[in-house]
């Protein structure tokens, strides 16, 4: 999504094309998700209010923080200090929201919210998040929107996901959405 601070070298627009909140809210997410499903939504703290708006626009209800990515420097030593007007951002939350009444597939009761992982290319998320989602929810159908890269076992959509030839901004329609999980990287 678009931030108001476009002049910064770290601005998303300097790394990839972005969409407005209005356009993201208008995506036909209902066409690619089951009536009863779970959403894992990455956001940043300056965009937390917009993330809640997006959750509601897509027909989901906020439940909890799924993960808190504590960003390490690229070499893995010391904490990464990102941008920030008040404090320097070095964590990124992944929210959990639900649509309908999804089965609680919880496979493990030992999943920690904390993910410590070095930063990667802009907006790329730690692979451990996908692993934790599968450990938590089981190996059920799942799709990742705005994927920066493909991942085994995940349907991916986005103008940078290598396994897709689907043009942005309209995501693919899925035939079988039973038990669908969604992980959105915005």
Regions found by a protein language model. Name each.
Residues 1-186:
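Class I S-adenosyl-L-methionine-dependent methyltransferase catalytic core
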């Amino acid at each position: 999504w678009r931030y108001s601070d476009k002049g910064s070298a770290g601005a998303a627009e300097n790394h990839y094309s972005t969409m407005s909140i209005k356009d993201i809210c208008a995506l036909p997410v209902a066409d690619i998700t089951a009536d009863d499903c779970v959403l894992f939504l990455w956001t940043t703290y300056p965009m937390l209010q917009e993330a809640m708006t997006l959750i509601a626009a897509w027909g989901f209800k906020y439940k909890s923080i799924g993960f808190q990515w504590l960003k390490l420097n690229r070499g893995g030593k010391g904490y990464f200090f990102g941008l920030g007007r008040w404090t320097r951002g070095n964590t990124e939350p992944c929210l959990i929201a639900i649509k309908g009444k999804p089965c609680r597939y919880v496979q493990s009761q030992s999943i920690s919210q904390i993910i410590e992982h070095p930063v990667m290319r802009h907006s790329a998320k730690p692979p451990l998040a996908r692993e934790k989602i599968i450990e938590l929810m089981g190996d059920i159908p799942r799709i990742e929107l705005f994927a920066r890269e493909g991942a085994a076992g995940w349907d991916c959509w986005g103008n940078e996901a290598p396994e897709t030839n689907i043009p942005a901004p309209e995501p693919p329609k899925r035939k079988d959405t039973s038990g669908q999980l969604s992980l959105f990287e915005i």
